[in-house]
Every structure is written in structure tokens, then in C-alpha cells.
Amino acid sequence: MIENFISDPHNVKFVENFFNSELFSSLSTDYPIVMISDHYVAEELLPPILDFMDNLGYRVILLTFPPGEKNKTWETFISLQNQLIDQGVSLGSTIIGIGGGIILDMAGFLASTYCRGVPLFLIPTTLTAMIDASIGGKNGINLRGFKNRLGTFYPPKDVWICPEFLATLPKKEWLHGIPEAIKHGCIADAYIWEFLDNCRDRLFSSQEILHEFIKRNCMVKAAIVAKDPKDQNLRKTLNFGHTIAHAIETLSKGHISHGLAVSVGMMIEMRISLESGIMKNPYLIEQLDNLLKYFCLPTALQELGSLIPQHLHNEFYHPENILHTLGYDKKNLSKKAVRMVMVEHLGRAASCNGAYCATPHTDILYEVLKSECHVVCNN
């Protein structure tokens, strides 16, 4: 079964069985297909896929790079660009990114810049990539440790979501995708929280429930992006929790995964929303805390300590260092004015006069961060 369930801002297909020749019908056999992935995915998932494509008559050029956020860099990007040239890849070729969010970001940036743009297809294999990274056309790489500092808007021709890939992942990788779904509930669709509350015990055991969950989240993100494809206003709401999260990832030198960073980032940014007077219901923080904890996700900076090398603790648990890193966030209009998404109530991000992000008072921001770091320093 192939279901084209999203067409705006780009096509997204839901695929129950990846090994279906109909799925590949839009790809020409006249030119090579360039598949971008990492070493792990290439070894664990790609052999049967490459055999299948070979039987369909495709010539596939496989380019891989080492897994992990630390390799989402300019050096990796240039290395892959050089390999495209060495392989004689031309405008007729199509780039396919297959894997998690890091791979899809790299594939998108490559496709958008090589020969000023070649066709791009995305095949997400993690929950985070399925409900977030593959939707919307954003891509990018890190520069000097700062998240997604270089990137473009480049919508894929198609996204193929095949949940059977999730079966190859350890449970913790499934859980790392949950914060993005909870974020969608915070900013746009309160029903997602209700869905998680009602179905959380069966989310990963019922195929029907999992499929509904994935589709719902994809449609939430697609609807937002369709209204603001270039991230001028409404789309910024998708960054809820990410301002703090990106600082966490930067200061941890890549030791904290994106999903765990977003989990803690949402808790901190919701506290800032409350302290700033934008959110009126303090119980919402308790609800968020309980929902994240049910899925064994962290809700405070303190819970990330065991994942960070000891020699980084002093730098990581320092409010001034976090504030300094926040100054480099892409949403900022200036380095001194940190901007972040505020939640008004469940299912609604604050419009902030149409900007959909605001600059919290420095004292509020500092005190919230200080309280997070203080707990660790006193233990």
C-alpha cells in the first residue's frame, strides 16, 4: 500500500512495504541514483534495498559518512561534494537521503547546492526523522559546534515514510522521537497529548496506533510549514524547546542527543513562558513533566549529567555559559536579544504580535537557568 497523504508543502507518502516497484516509478533509470547515508544505516539496512534497486535496473552510487552529530560538519559536506564530482554525478541524477535526521539534513544540503540543485528524495528511518526532519524542506550542517548554522530551504520531491524501518531500532531510539510529538501538542494540536495519554501503553505494540500517531504528527508539521515555508513567522513555533535544546547540544559537545535536549528544552522554555506571564496555567508544567517521564525522558538539566564527560560539567552547568551560547541562536535579531517560542496554553503557541517568538526578560531567563544549574551544583 502506498498512500500519498500530504501534498503541501511537498509530497509525503506512507508506505507499508518498501519493496514495491510502484514506489520507484517516478525515478528514472537513465541516470545514477546517489544514496546518502551513514556507515551504520548502510550496513544494517541498505543491502536488501540496494539489491532490490539493482533488480529494478537502477545504478546506485552509495556515499556514506560516520554516524553522529559530531560528523554533521563542513568537512563532511565538502568530502561528499568532492565524491559527487569524482563519481561524475550530473543534473540528471537524483539524491536520496536514507536514515535519521542528521543524514537527511546532510542529503538535503548536498542536493540543494550541488549544481545549484538536483532532485531530492528522503527516506526517514527513525521516528524523529519521520515526524520532523523529513517534513518541510529545511536542511543544514553545524559550523564551529553551532547547530545548523549553514543550510537552505529545499523541499524534497517526495518523502517515503515506511514504519517497518523502526523495527530495526533499539527502544531508546523510538523514545527520542517522542519529544517532537509532544512539542506538536504544545504548540498546535492538543489532541496529540490526549492521544499519547490514551494510547501510550500500546503506541509501540499496535501497528494501527503507531501509524495514526506518525501521520497525525506529519500533518501537524506540514500544515504549519505550508503556511510559512521560509520560516518568517508561524513556522518558528516548531522551534519550541529548541532554543535551549540547541544550547544543550552545543555545550555538551554532541554527547546529548537532539531528542533528549528537546525534552529538557521544552520544560525550561515552558517555565520561562510561565514566569514571563504568557502562560497562565502552572499545572501545564506538571502535565508536561509527567508525560515526558512516562516515556523515560529527562525533564531537567540535572538528569543529563551522566551522559556528559566529567571534564565538561563545569562549563555545561553554568548559567552564563548557557546564556552566551543562546546568543548564537538563529532566531535572534541580535546577539544580545535571545528569542524563543512561548506557549500560551496547551495546543497554542503565543503569537507575540505575529512574530511567534519573543525575547524573555534577561532576569527571568537567568533565574530559570540558574535554578536548573543550582540543583546540580548543590548535589
Curated annotation (Swiss-Prot):
- EC number(s) given by UniProt: 4.2.3.4
Q: Where in the cell is it found?
A: Cytoplasm
Gene Ontology BP term (one):
amino acid biosynthetic process
Supply the InterPro entries for this chain: Dehydroquinate_synthase (IPR050071), DHQ_synth_AroB (IPR016037), DHQ_synth_fam (IPR030963), DHQS/DOIS_N (IPR030960), DHQS_C (IPR056179)
Q: Name one GO molecular function term.
A: metal ion binding
- Tell me which UniProt keywords the record has, alphabetically: Amino-acid biosynthesis, Aromatic amino acid biosynthesis, Cobalt, Cytoplasm, Lyase, Metal-binding, NAD, Nucleotide-binding, Zinc
Pathway recorded for this protein: Metabolic intermediate biosynthesis; chorismate biosynthesis; chorismate from D-erythrose 4-phosphate and phosphoenolpyruvate: step 2/7
Please tell me whether the keyword Nucleus is annotated for this protein: no
Please tell me which top-level EC class this enzyme sits in.
lyase
Gene Ontology cellular-component annotations: cytoplasm
- Briefly state the protein's biological role: Catalyzes the conversion of 3-deoxy-D-arabino-heptulosonate 7-phosphate (DAHP) to dehydroquinate (DHQ).
Name of the featured protein: 3-dehydroquinate synthase
